[in-house]
Swiss-Prot record:
Acts as a processive, ATP-dependent zinc metallopeptidase for both cytoplasmic and membrane proteins. Plays a role in the quality control of integral membrane proteins. The gene is ftsH. GO terms for molecular function: ATP binding; ATP hydrolysis activity; ATP-dependent peptidase activity; metalloendopeptidase activity; zinc ion binding. This is ATP-dependent zinc metalloprotease FtsH. It is found in: Cell membrane. The keyword Protease applies. Residues 38-131 are extracellular. In the central section; belongs to the AAA ATPase family. In the C-terminal section; belongs to the peptidase M41 family.
């Protein structure tokens, strides 16, 4: 398809019309200045010329034939003797008939006989000589307007072609290495769903004979980075068919009708390449519900969507064209786009679980030099919620860190640091705590660790650190005991208790509090409110008080439906406060019962600054951190020596 599109002219390439104008100006200026700078020529009549010869004013005479077959004309030119040239004049010229030239020659012969010391030099050119410069300049003056007219017509034609190119589709035909299913990990169910599409593209006759209709459109739904585009490429790579990819925003332009024209052109090209796959990324840019949003609809977008609907439902089911699209906002799509016969199948790309993350790590590690001792299962456990794109970025960051330190392989330490950089930002090593501030941050993070160790169903603390990153002075990395689709009320209460552990530790140990619990409160309040208004986990009963409004404003749901009274709103606030208070008191009770553990974890945090799960478990079991204590002993012994 790209071959049909004319190559675009470089922005640095000058316009042909400008070049022609510059050339014409240069020629005109050349002749103008040549004329201005050239010495003046005296034009004689015959009697003046004879008088000048007889008075000794003429030094040279050059006769050149300039007439044709019917006119015996001669051009006589020459120079004056010294001191006899008129002011500003360098030469003379006179045109004579042949018989009059003979008379002039006789006069010159007589003059030379009388003045042998200062004779007139005579030269004779019997044939016409060609003046190439005059011919070239004449031809240029004749040809320039013709060339100018031709270029103007070509420019007009080019503008017309540009207008046509403006309405052509911008889909790109995928070339180069084909993506295969082996390049995709952690999406076994999604790949199985796509298997029949691949079989249809390879063996369409088998389905046609059975009277089966393969889905015309497949909509891939999922969070950003879950592999929607990669899966679509893999389907095309496995089926060995052309793959046309385009973004939804490429259809929409300022001018009404352009998007619809591009849709028509896209399907025209696809029919010529069938069987093939058309992939529309971010289809919500063009497929958003018609008439929705502030200010009503958008004529250009709606016309484009209408044309897309017609094309999807208009071509024959046996053409072998499958439409695939991706979006992370299926709620904003027009219902007509999702009905059977168009996008009649939806495949949800889930955020990978621990097993899937491990498989994805193995795929992205193929091109990386990793330490053989690294266990992918441990890495996968430490990065809950990471998508495939996040994992690729994680390993790339780890590779950059290893290369920066001139190491030959990527270590587990590099991966840990990369995970921290991806989630929280780079460490702010230049920022220094005051001793009191460092102690408060250490006890805050130690409070989270104690709750994770002592509260049943609380998430496991994989790491705590007091190294500042981003806006956080320190943070604790949690991983759930088990990744689930559904969570019990007791598990949600444990999550809230874990979030409040840091503030409780500050209050108990310092009888003061800091702003460090800002994000903890945000997470705890959101969970508690969801328990009351969405999950029915309060005394208000199994009623959903808040839900998505379903109204799309500028592509995003800004509002929540309020289907309850102000009195109920007050009850909701009381229930949320009751949940937070209950969890806060529970955290206080646990911290008070485990003050020694809190002190030990905080003590080592102040010294080491970062503790792993292994370190925390050792401190909880023995009250010590052996590797650090041994290191302290060695340093003390060196100082004493």
């Amino acid at each position: 398809m790209n071959k049909q599109q004319k190559p675009k002219r470089s922005p640095l390439r000058p316009d042909y019309l400008v070049i022609v104008i510059i050339i014409l100006l240069a020629i005109g200026m050349y002749f103008f200045f040549t004329e201005m700078m050239a010495p003046k020529v005296k034009q004689f009549d015959e009697f003046e010329f004879i008088a000048a010869i007889e008075s000794g004013q003429i030094a040279t005479v050059r006769s050149e034939y300039v007439g044709g077959d019917n006119f015996n004309l001669w051009e006589v030119t020459g120079t004056f003797t010294t001191g006899n040239a008129p002011e500003g004049v360098g030469s003379y010229v006179i045109i004579l008939y042949g018989d009059r030239l003979n008379n002039i020659q006789d006069i010159i012969i007589t003059y030379n006989e009388l003045n042998p010391s200062t004779p007139i030099t005579v030269s004779f050119v019997p044939h016409v000589s060609v003046d190439f410069w005059n011919i070239i300049s004449t031809l240029l003056l004749i040809a320039a307007p013709i060339v100018l007219v031709v270029i103007m017509f070509r420019s007009m034609s080019s503008q017309s072609n540009k207008a046509q190119d403006f309405t052509k589709n911008r889909a790109k035909l995928s070339q180069g290495r084909k993506v295969k299913f082996s390049d995709i990990a952690g999406a076994d169910e999604e790949k199985a769903e796509m298997a029949e599409l691949i079989d249809f593209l390879k063996n369409p006759k088998k389905y046609a004979d059975m009277g089966a209709r393969v889905p015309k459109g497949v909509l891939l739904v999922g969070q950003p980075g879950t592999g929607k585009t990669l899966l679509a490429k893999a389907v095309a790579g496995e089926a060995q068919v052309p793959f046309f990819s385009i973004s939804g925003s490429d259809f929409v332009e300022l001018y009404v009708g352009v998007g619809a024209s591009r849709v028509r052109d896209l399907f025209k090209v696809a029919k010529q390449s069938a069987p093939c796959i058309i992939f529309i990324d971010e289809i919500d840019a063009v497929g958003r519900q018609r008439g929705a949003g502030m200010g009503g609809g958008n004529d250009e977008r709606e016309q484009t969507l209408n044309q897309l609907l017609v094309e999807m439902d208009g071509f024959s089911a046996n053409l072998g064209i499958i439409i695939m699209a991706a979006t992370n906002r299926p709620d904003v799509l027009d219902p007509a786009l999702l009905r059977p016969g168009r996008f009649d199948r939806q495949i949800t790309m889930q955020v990978p679980d621990q097993k899937s993350r491990e498989e994805i790590l193995k795929v992205h590690a193929r091109s990386k030099k990793l330490d053989p001792t690294i266990k992918f299962s441990e890495v996968a456990m430490r990065i809950p919620g990471f998508t495939g794109a996040d994992i690729e970025n994680l390993l790339n960051e780890a590779a950059l860190l290893a290369a920066r330190e001139s190491r030959t392989v990527i270590s587990m330490q590099d991966i840990d640091e990369a995970a921290d950089r991806v989630t929280m930002g780079p460490a702010k090593k230049s920022r220094k705590y005051s001793p009191n501030e460092k102690k408060m941050v250490a006890y805050h993070e130690a409070g989270h660790a104690v709750i994770g160790l002592k509260v049943n169903l609380a998430s496991t603390v994989q790491k705590v650190t007091i190294v500042p990153r981003g806006r956080a002075g320190g943070y604790a990395l949690y991983t759930p005991v088990e990744e689930k689709f559904n969570y019990a009320k007791s598990e949600l209460l444990a999550m809230i208790t874990s979030a409040l552990g840091g503030r409780v530790a500050e209050e108990i140990m310092f009888d003061d509090v800091t702003t460090g619990a800002y994000d903890d409160f945000k997470r705890a309040t959101k969970l508690a409110r969801s328990m009351v208004t969405e999950y029915g986990m309060s005394d208000l009963g199994p009623i959903q008080y808040e839900s998505d409004s379903g109204n799309v404003f500028l592509g995003r749901d800004y509002l929540k439906d309020k289907n309850f009274s102000d009195a109920v709103a007050l009850e909701i606030d009381r229930e949320v406060r009751a949940i937070i208070t209950e969890c806060y008191e529970h955290a206080r009770k646990v911290i008070n019962e485990n003050k020694n553990l809190l002190d030990n974890i905080a003590k080592y945090l102040i010294a080491v600054e970062t503790l792993t799960k292994t370190d925390i478990d050792e401190i909880a079991a023995t009250g010590q951190l052996q590797w650090w204590d041994n290191r302290e002993v060695e340093e003390d012994s060196k100082k004493s020596e």
